[in-house]
Amino acid sequence: MAEVLALQDRMNDAALRGGGAAFDEFLSKNFVASDPSNTIRHRDDMIALFSSGRIAYSSVKTAIDYADQLAEDIVVVMGTETTEQSAVPSDTGLESVAIGETLNRRFTNVYRKEDGAWRLLIKQSTITPVK
């Protein structure tokens, strides 16, 4: 479990640095996400968005509400993410989000152990109202 939570922290750090290439290490070859713009994205799409700087954050904060290892090779993590946008691509369905705006999201991440290393397999996130 600690390995998965550390991986999640490293992914947040990479997102802050705009490190799309780092996501190559973190994402499963079969990665799929349902993102806040109600778009299904696969691994290469996500890496390209971060590598190009089309998605960028000036801050990312995560609060874990639930984390459990459901099988030897599966961990589920649920919680909230608060991000401050430093770039917003115009073709992602988030055109109304302003640079500098804070977004709150609920997320579910499913990690799978592949070839001895934990990788993010599935991500779902939904924008929630700012409290």
What residue ranges belong to the model's regions?
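A beta-strand edge to alpha-helix "cap/lid" segment located at domain peripheries
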Residues: M1-F26, N30-K131
